């Protein structure tokens, strides 16, 4: 199970427009190994109302999911 800052309920693909992360969310949904609720496929333990504020944490999760474009995500923003 993935954790962010010790919290296992935060989804890396939550609604992020307030934090300017719309581009990252769209990118991960299109190219990442994530389903619509935000966790790696077949690992649904998230509350999509939780908010993630660190773009670098999304990149780290992408890297752990073996997404070769995790650095590109940061460079694109």
From Swiss-Prot:
Entry keyword annotation includes Magnesium: no
ANK repeat residues: 8-38
Keywords for the protein's UniProt record, in alphabetical order: ANK repeat
Protein name in the entry: Putative ankyrin repeat protein RC0956
Naturally occurring in which organism (per UniProt): Rickettsia conorii (strain ATCC VR-613 / Malish 7)
């Amino acid at each position: 199970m993935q954790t962010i800052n010790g919290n296992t309920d935060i989804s890396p693909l939550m609604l992020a427009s307030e934090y300017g992360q719309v581009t990252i969310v769209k990118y991960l949904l299109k190219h990442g190994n994530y389903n619509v609720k935000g966790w790696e496929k077949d690992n649904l333990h998230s509350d999509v109302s939780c908010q993630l504020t660190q773009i670098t944490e999304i990149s780290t999760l992408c890297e752990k999911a073996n997404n070769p474009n995790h650095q590109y995500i940061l460079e694109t923003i």
